Regions:
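Long, amphipathic alpha-helical surface segments
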Residues: 2-47, 54-61, 66-84, 92-93, ...
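Short alpha-helical scaffolding segments that buttress acidic/His motifs in well-ordered protein cores
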Residues: 32, 98-106, 134-136
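Short, structured surface segments that line ligand/substrate-binding pockets
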Residues: 88-99
Length: 168
C-alpha cells in the first residue's frame, strides 16, 4: 500500500462509525429524493419496471397508488435494507459521505450490481481515488445512456468525495 492510500485509509478510519451500524444521513436521503422524485401513481421507469413513490419497485403493479406518507415510510424502510447491503459488502471503514453515496448508488442499481462491481473491488482494496470514476460508469438503463443517470452518478461521485453535489 503506498503512502497516499495509507494516509487516506487512516483519515477515513478517524471519520467513520464502522463497528456501529451506519445510517444514511439527511444529505444522502436528499440526493435520493431529488433524483428518484416522488410519484404517487405507478409508472414504468426507463428500465421498464413498474415503479412508485421514491423509486420503489417491490410489489408494484400498473394502477397502484400511494399517499405521500406511505412513500416516505417505504423509503425509510427500504433505505434501512440498502444500508445493510452496503455495510455487508464494504469491508473497510467509510466516512458518512462515502456511505451516503454508496447507499444512494445501491438504492438505484441494486445489491447485485454492487456485489459484482469493480467499484466494490476498488473500495475493498482501499483504492478510494478510483471509486468516483467507477460510480460514473453506471449511466445506462435498458442499454441506453441517460442524461438523468449521468447527472445522478456525478452527484453520487461528488458526495462520495465530500463535495457539494447540489449544482449537478
Amino acid at each position: 500500500m503506498n503512502l497516499k492510500k495509507l494516509w487516506f485509509t487512516i483519515e477515513k478510519l478517524l471519520q467513520t462509525t464502522k463497528g456501529n451500524k451506519m445510517k444514511i444521513s439527511e444529505e444522502g436521503k436528499a440526493l435520493i429524493k431529488r433524483f428518484e422524485g416522488c410519484k404517487l401513481e405507478a409508472y414504468l421507469c426507463p428500465a421498464n419496471k413498474w415503479t412508485i413513490a421514491y423509486g420503489r419497485i417491490k410489489d408494484v403493479k400498473e394502477g397502484d397508488t400511494c399517499t405521500q406518507e406511505q412513500a416516505e415510510k417505504w423509503l425509510d424502510e427500504e433505505l434501512e435494507e440498502y444500508e445493510g447491503y452496503v455495510e455487508n459488502a464494504v469491508k473497510l471503514p467509510l466516512s458518512q459521505c462515502q456511505f451516503d453515496a454508496l447507499v444512494a448508488w445501491t438504492y438505484n442499481l441494486g445489491p447485485t450490481n454492487l456485489s459484482s462491481s469493480t467499484m466494490l473491488k476498488c473500495l475493498n482494496k482501499a483504492e478510494f481515488d478510483r471509486v468516483p470514476s467507477e460510480i460514473k460508469r453506471w449511466n445506462k438503463a435498458g442499454g441506453e445512456v441517460l442524461d438523468g443517470l449521468i447527472r445522478r452518478r456525478e452527484a453520487e461521485a461528488l458526495l462520495f468525495q465530500g463535495k457539494d453535489w447540489h449544482e449537478v
